[in-house]
């Protein structure tokens, strides 16, 4: 009988050598890129209080989190989100630092989130956050950083879809409908369920102009210019106009950096987490149906910790990026340093040690063979991807 404990729980996975190496390369390249841009790395604990994620606008669903009780009887969770703990750290430990404050991190997230991580319950997340700036330039710079990060990893066939939560929120705030009805409207727009949305809107007692805009919002996606032209024909109010101007400024900024081909606009995009207050965005590739990155503005989040501080940021899903690189065959040839296998004959240990030291100083990977049979050595070298076998001494 096979013991059940040899199998993995649902939603987690083992990473073998090649995958670990590839993930390490991805994370190293991201951190190198971000440090060059002035971001500073922090790390939050794996365990947090449950209440941190269940208050106000940042509320996460309890059934999406992994909960446990400590020895004192306090309810804890495995970190289900990357942004909230960083916001807590900034508000409680970094108030006196120089702002704008640019933070980056790489850490594991534990959450059942099919949109962002498929069926994975544990996923690796790398992110950046900018605190203390309330401007479209900060949002634009964050999206540019996301694009530069994906390009630095070797991805080219990707698209960043940009949305604006202020538009839909402005419309919903003006409607005399229940919270459940608002939530249903948001869900239907998010899923682009046109027929059901239209049926629901016909039943609700709302202004005809509002009904028209809500019907059209799921259709408003595509190039920035095309979407703006379509919106101009709708009866929008001043709040929506200001939100659209902000979105347009961000798109112009990204285009000025030469990244216009990577962006599109989707006014029907909704935020999966409730703390977003403005611009939001998601990144995809054609080869992979899941999200590679997501982010946006969350100006009210730190108020929960007694600090009034605007913020914006994004997170990359490392494992999804690994898959995208593999599926799209876009990964740059990570040949890495030369890999040599030293084979010692006649007990020439001193010569082997000198040669190994010399090669290591040049940045090579050097392994001293523990095998003696020539055929076994050849098989081992091929399977390990060794570039060259170096023999020290003469074969007997």
From Swiss-Prot:
Transmembrane regions: none
**Which Pfam family is one of this chain's hits?**
tRNA-synt_His
Its main localization is cytoplasm
**GO CC annotation terms, alphabetical:** cytoplasm
> Keywords for this entry?
Amino-acid biosynthesis, Cytoplasm, Histidine biosynthesis
The yes or no answer to whether the keyword Cell wall biogenesis/degradation is present is no
Give the matching Gene3D superfamilies.
Answer: Bira Bifunctional Protein, Domain 2
- Is-annotated flag, keyword Amino-acid biosynthesis? yes
Localization, per the record, is: Cytoplasm
* Residue ranges of coiled coil: none
Q: In which pathway does it act?
A: Amino-acid biosynthesis; L-histidine biosynthesis; L-histidine from 5-phospho-alpha-D-ribose 1-diphosphate: step 1/9
Q: Where does the record locate the signal sequence feature?
A: none
What PROSITE patterns does its record include? AA_TRNA_LIGASE_II (PS50862)
User: Biological process GO annotation list?
Assistant: histidyl-tRNA aminoacylation; L-histidine biosynthetic process
GO terms, molecular function: catalytic activity, acting on a protein; histidine-tRNA ligase activity; transferase activity
- Please report which protein family the annotation says this sequence is part of: Belongs to the class-II aminoacyl-tRNA synthetase family. HisZ subfamily.
**NCBIfam families, alphabetized:** hisZ_biosyn_reg
What PANTHER family does the database record attribute to this sequence? ATP PHOSPHORIBOSYLTRANSFERASE REGULATORY SUBUNIT, HISTIDYL-TRNA SYNTHETASE
According to its UniProt entry, the function of this protein is described as: Required for the first step of histidine biosynthesis. May allow the feedback regulation of ATP phosphoribosyltransferase activity by histidine.
The record's misc note reads: This function is generally fulfilled by the C-terminal part of HisG, which is missing in some bacteria such as this one.
Q: How does it assemble?
A: Heteromultimer composed of HisG and HisZ subunits.
Q: What name is this protein filed under?
A: ATP phosphoribosyltransferase regulatory subunit
The organism's taxonomy opens as: Bacteria, Bacillati, Bacillota, Clostridia, Peptostreptococcales
Gene behind the chain = hisZ
């Amino acid at each position: 009988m096979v013991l059940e404990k040899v199998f993995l729980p649902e939603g987690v996975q083992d990473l073998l050598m090649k995958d670990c190496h590839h993930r390490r390369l991805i994370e190293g390249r991201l951190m190198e890129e971000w440090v060059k841009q002035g971001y500073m790395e922090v790390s939050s604990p794996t365990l947090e209080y449950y209440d941190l994620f269940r208050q106000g606008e940042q509320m996460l669903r309890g059934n999406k989190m992994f909960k446990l009780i400590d020895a004192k009887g306090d309810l804890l969770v495995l970190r289900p989100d990357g942004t909230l703990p960083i916001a807590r750290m900034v508000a409680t430990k970094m108030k006196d630092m120089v702002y704008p404050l640019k933070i980056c991190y790489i850490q594991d997230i534990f959450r059942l989130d099919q949109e962002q991580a498929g069926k994975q319950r544990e996923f690796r997340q790398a992110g950046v956050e900018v605190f203390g700036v309330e401007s479209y330039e900060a949002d634009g710079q964050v999206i540019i950083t996301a694009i530069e990060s994906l390009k630095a990893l070797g991805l080219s066939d990707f698209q960043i879809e940009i949305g604006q939560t202020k538009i839909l929120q402005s419309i919903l705030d003006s409607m005399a409908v229940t919270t459940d009805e608002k939530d249903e409207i948001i869900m239907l727009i998010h899923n682009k369920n046109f027929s059901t949305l239209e049926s629901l809107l016909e039943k609700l007692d709302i202004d005809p102009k509002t009904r028209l805009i809500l019907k059209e919002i799921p259709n408003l996606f595509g190039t920035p210019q095309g979407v703006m032209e379509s919106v101009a024909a709708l009866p929008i109010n001043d709040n929506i106009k200001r939100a659209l101007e902000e979105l347009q400024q961000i798109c112009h900024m990204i285009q000025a950096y030469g990244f216009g081909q990577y962006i599109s606009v989707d006014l029907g995009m909704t935020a999966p987490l409730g703390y977003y207050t403005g611009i939001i965005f998601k990144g995809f590739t054609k080869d992979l149906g899941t999200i590679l990155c997501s982010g946006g503005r969350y100006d009210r989040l730190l108020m929960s910790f007694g600090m009034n501080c605007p913020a914006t940021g994004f997170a990359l899903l490392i494992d999804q990026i690994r898959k995208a690189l593999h599926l799209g065959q876009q990964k740059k040839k990570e040949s890495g340093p030369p890999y040599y296998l030293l084979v010692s004959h006649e007990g020439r240990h001193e010569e082997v040690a000198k040669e190994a030291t010399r090669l290591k100083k040049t940045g090579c990977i050097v392994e001293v063979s523990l095998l003696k049979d020539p055929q076994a050595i050849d098989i081992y070298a091929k399977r390990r991807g060794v570039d060259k076998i170096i023999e020290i001494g003469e074969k007997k």
